[in-house]
């Protein structure tokens, strides 16, 4: 059964090759896409229903139906030590797709010199398992289905 993955935030859908980090751009962690968020306060929501297997101020990993989905808010944002991010849930929580998980402000992160493009990855999946549901360049709202993994 295919797992539908939602955009964790509003923004422009981008190919992973646009992400200026080879770990994501070369799909080393798995296939997916990226979201270039609007500047200003943004709420990152759960892209799938499941268990928050990992949760950091700058990232979330959700286990769902045997799949693991990663949202990484911006790049190299771990060095901010949580500054500019507000975590709304706890590791181990069960969440529903579309539920708010982390509040952040991409404009603050960008002002600090860090990229805000946000990879959305199906961890350790194969590219052949992914069906992208919206074209690169499409502007989506949080909660819009963007790909399926099967």
Locations of regions flagged by a protein language model:
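Contiguous, well-folded functional domains in the mature portion of proteins
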Residues: 1-150
């Amino acid at each position: 059964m295919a797992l539908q993955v939602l955009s964790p935030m509003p923004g422009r859908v981008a190919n992973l090759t646009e992400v200026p980090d080879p770990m994501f751009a070369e799909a080393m962690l798995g296939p997916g896409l990226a979201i270039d968020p609007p500047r200003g306060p943004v709420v990152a929501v759960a892209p799938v229903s499941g268990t928050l297997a990992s949760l950091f101020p700058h990232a979330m990993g959700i286990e769902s139906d045997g799949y693991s989905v990663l949202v990484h808010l911006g790049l190299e944002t771990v060095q901010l030590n949580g500054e500019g991010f507000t975590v709304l849930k706890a590791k181990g929580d069960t969440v529903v797709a579309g539920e708010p998980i982390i509040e952040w402000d991409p404009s603050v992160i960008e002002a600090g010199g860090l990229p805000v493009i946000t990879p959305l990855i199906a961890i350790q999946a194969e590219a052949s398992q992914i069906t992208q549901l919206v074209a690169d360049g499409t502007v989506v709202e949080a909660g819009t289905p963007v790909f399926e993994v099967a």
